[in-house]
């Protein structure tokens, strides 16, 4: 690095009002992105906490009624403390950096009602989508800033790093000194880009410091991925501005490449994966569920008799208990069995799409960074799919606990209820999808080095 050129460029930047405004804009937007994501996550977490509190309050009341019945304290109706009325909450807890990478959290269900009354499709608690325009363009979080806005800021700072001197004929006078044009461009870009990179890292470190339960590996992964991504863009800008004789020509090329990497390739990749691995028909899933529910309701007596023949040790309990409980439980079981093939198709289709996107992401460093960061934050499709799968298994376990009591019109004991684990414990013990960042980082750094090396080789020749 040529210190004279470097500090001279810093002095020029200090005297440039446009550059100062651009850097101030970068500072404000970068910190705003962290604040915006944190504010959204706080509101989301408050909503989930309130939901959990409401469901747990109902569960406590149900347990209190069951305890009173076991202790013979007062009379109870046939509807009181029935196992079909058990309600337990299940919420999707994301990673420590989810406030900087909202990902799929805005549009995927994050809270479920776990109850024998529900099946895999009806356990999703009602929730409200955000403003459609917000969902269309994406919420302002740090991932949006660093993947979409930061490259534009790098382009705005560096597109005329040498073109204006060439147009005014000043480059020849500058090159009369013992320096090459490539050296001039490199030092000027280092001076201009270093301040922006410092701002980005400052906002990133701020976002990491406000995270709860952040591990060193996650923090190091974020910093390394962001630096590798910015290094790629610096290499690309270095190549374009070195070959552009006019600033407008270089700017148009860089903006076109930004559109290609940030918008066109990600959209095309999603279209390709959707075409290759289409989702099964949701109408078919709903139709199968309705048919199964209808058939199970009609055959309640037959299904109950078949169950009792398989379990002769059980006897029918309180005759005052309405058959609706038994019918609902049996219909949910039939729905689960009849829709299992198409639900499996949904899961396999999602897995195939994600596996294909893991390959197609290497067409665009922007996609690489986005997918890597939201995967670390556990706000990606794989994490949400695992959440729904874990909740479905949790519901099946509860159904196994209450099945005998429901079908024989009896209650479960308080001890049996207390042995049911809460969903948070199960989710914490669940193995999360592994995230590999070595290949993404190595690929982006390799691209940056190739672009810089190609530019230097051309300048020497």
Predicted regions, residues:
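Hydrophobic/aromatic residues in alpha-helical transmembrane segments
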Residues: 154-158, 202, 235-236, 252, ...
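Membrane-helix interface segments
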Residues: 18, 180, 215, 219, ...
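Membrane-water interface at transmembrane helix exits
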Residues: 159-163, 207, 211, 237, ...
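Secretory targeting signals
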Residues: 30-40, 58, 133-134, 141, ...
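Long, hydrophobic alpha-helical segments
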Residues: 138-164, 168, 445-447, 451
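Alpha-helical transmembrane segments and their helix-entry boundary regions
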Residues: 19-20, 152, 184, 249-251
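Transmembrane alpha-helical segments and their membrane-interface loop/helix boundaries
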Residues: 1-135, 251, 258-461
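Helix-loop-helix units of permease transmembrane domains in multi-pass membrane transporters
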Residues: 4-6, 156-197, 458-461
